[in-house]
Structures are given as structure tokens and as C-alpha cells.
Amino acid sequence: MAATPEFGSLRSDDDHWDIVSSVGYTALLVAGWRALHAVGPQPLVRDEYAKYFITASRDPYLMNLLANPGTSLNETAFPRLYGVQTRFFDDFFSSAGDTGIRQAVIVAAGLDSRAYRLKWPNGATVFEIDLPKVLEFKARVLAEQGAIPNAGRSEVAADLRADWPRALKAAGFDPQRSSAWSVEGLLPYLTNDAQSALFTRIGELCAPGSRIAVGALGSRLDRKQLAALEATHPGVNISGDVDFSALTYEPKTDSAQWLAAHGWAVEPVRNTLELQTSYGMTPPDVDVQMDSFMHSQYITATR
């Protein structure tokens, strides 16, 4: 049996990717799970654009998943988990808009389509930060579908390890006005120092009244954990050949504690199971077991 790769073994300080390689492929995988959730029973959200990204990628594994969607509680676990996550961030931006915030920043936007899916208030602008190749792929696919955003949309092609605040401001972001920020699915792919730098830079760009939502994990499902979960819950592992441990870094400073110590008023932290309950769902055993590995945290805070 091959040895389990060390955390971050497929990463380097200056690595880059497109949508079908390295970290970029995880965005495609999550889009596939959102597409599956949209056609599943009682979806929390319907991302009607997600399926088009899979088709455009021509990835055989994901195309097969969409052509033959599983229906059991085990087979729909990952799509359900990401349905919960998507709903959380959707609600966050809707709530921020209700408070008068008109600048939304999606950090490491990947294949997020909220600028197109959500109803945004008049005058709202959605800033999407990600690597150029990821943004180019998304723009091409959405243009092919004739998609029109429901808010002003500004692409910020930048590496989060570089001077992305300069690029954000050049794209029209005004740090003197309040803003709402999402950090969704990103933190496992950052080192502890990079995570602290990200939060520091966000804080420096936030006027009073700004808000942030963070999805964090206390740990990640590595291949051994997925294999163990698959043994007790057949069909749950629909992540293909992705080895998350080799793409991500070890657990780091607690995000809620960091924010609270740096000027943010942090609301009570919830996990996936608590969110499911708040959405009127009863978490099945497979979801409970999955979260016992991942220790999910959903955080909201105000500046």
C-alpha cells in the first residue's frame, strides 16, 4: 500500500492552477456536488449554472456523476453538505444587503455564481477574486449560457499570496464603504501564516459595519478517513481521485478566535449539523459521522 502523502505535499509557495488541475479541480468538484444537490430531493439551493461548468470541463468522472446521480443518503452526503454551505453563504449576503451593504467580496471565488443566482439590491457590486485561468473559464462558460449578473460584477484576477488588495481597489472597491466578505472553502489550502495574512488584509480593507462569513474546518477528510467512512457508509465517497491531504495544510489557528482577537464581533459559531437543523433538516447518520471527522465551523462577524 502506498504511503499517505504528507499535508501539502502537492503544493509549493508559487504554484498556480487552472480549473482541471491541483486546487482548481476542487472548485470543479464542488461545482459538481452543487449540481447534484440541485437535482436531489428537497435541495436547499439550486445552482442552475453548476452543471454547465462540468459539461464544459469534459471531466469524465464528474460528467458520469451527473449522468448517473446517486439517490441514497450516503451517495448524496457530499452534495448535501455543500448545499448547506452554499445556503449559509447565500443567506449571509442577502442579510448583508438588507443592512445596506453594497460591496460584496468573494475571496477565492472559484466557480461561484452568486452574482447571477442571488437577488442583489440596487447599486450592489460583487467582486470575485481568483486566479486568472479560473476566472477566464467561468466567464467563458457563463457567457456561452447567456447568463446576466443581477448586480455589478467585477473580476479581480489575483493570487491571494500576492498584493491582491491593490488589485481589488483598482477594480473599484472602496475601503471607505462597508463591505461583506465570504471566505468559503479556502482556508484548508492556506498555511497558518497565509491565513493570518489574509484575515489581516481583509480587516485593513473593512470600514465600520463591514461583515465577514467564514467556512472553516478543524480537520479534513484524508484518504484513510474517507476509506473508513466508505466502509461503513457505502457510496459516500464521490470525490474521485482527489487527495485533499496532499493539497491542503495542517489545521491552524481557530478562525473565530483570531477574528475576535482582532477587532471583530463574532456571532455564535455553528457547524453543519446545527445549520441543517435550522433549515428544518434532520441530519442522517452519515452526515453526523462526516462532521465528526471534519469539525466544521460556520462563522459570521461584524467589524
From Swiss-Prot:
This is Putative S-adenosyl-L-methionine-dependent methyltransferase ML2020. Its EC number is 2.1.1.-. Gene3D superfamilies: Vaccinia Virus protein VP39 (3.40.50.150). GO terms for molecular function: methyltransferase activity. InterPro entries: Ppm1/Ppm2/Tcmp, SAM-dependent_MTases_sf, SAM_mthyl_Trfase_ML2640-like. NCBIfam families: mthyl_TIGR00027. Keywords: Methyltransferase, S-adenosyl-L-methionine, Transferase. GO terms for biological process: methylation. Transmembrane segments: none annotated. It comes from the Bacteria. Pfam families: LCM (PF04072). S-adenosyl-L-methionine binds at D130, D159, L160.
